[in-house]
A protein has these predicted regions:
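Short beta-strand "wing" residues that participate in macromolecule-binding interfaces
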Residues: 62
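Short, hydrophobic-biased segments on the C-terminal half of alpha helices
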Residues: 48-52
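Amphipathic alpha-helical dimerization/coiled-coil segments
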Residues: 83-114
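Short, cationic-aromatic polyanion-contact patches
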Residues: 65-85
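Short acidic, hydrophobic short linear motifs in intrinsically disordered regions
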Residues: 21-35
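Short alpha-helical segments that sit at the start of domains
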Residues: 1-22
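Glycine-centered, phosphate/nucleic-acid-interacting loop/turn motifs that mediate DNA/RNA or nucleotide
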Residues: 58
Length: 114
């Protein structure tokens, strides 16, 4: 499942907040503040829109507590990485893991330079 730059920044921030306090209900404002801490300034409404998109992709789950909505991860970072790796392998190597591994081995010197 493809994710854009802002979606990935939101997810990484979300997972970071979750790892610090597993019992915390995570709000949109928590994510807005977390992003601001790493220099990403976006409007509350922008973050809400992207988080709702992540809900529609079944990556986050939204629930209501009192009058506020909160979010939790439907996928942890490891599950998401595996899902993206499978998608990458399917899209670029026809699902052939051996081809993908050979590609990475052949390009590893270029990858290490960056």
């Amino acid at each position: 499942m493809a994710c854009g730059f802002l979606e990935m920044e939101i997810l990484n921030t979300f997972w970071e907040i979750s790892s610090i306090n597993e019992d915390k209900d995570i709000s949109i404002q928590d994510v807005v503040d977390g992003l601001a801490n790493i220099g990403i300034e976006r409007a509350y409404t922008t973050i809400k829109t992207v988080m709702d998109r992540l809900v529609s992709k079944s990556i986050l789950v939204r629930y209501k507590s009192g009058k506020k909505f909160f979010y939790k991860a439907a996928m942890d970072k490891h599950e998401m990485a595996l899902d993206m790796l499978h998608e990458f392998t399917d899209n670029f190597f026809g699902g052939d893991v051996a081809k993908m591994v050979r590609f990475v081995e052949n390009e590893s010197s270029h990858l290490l330079v960056k």
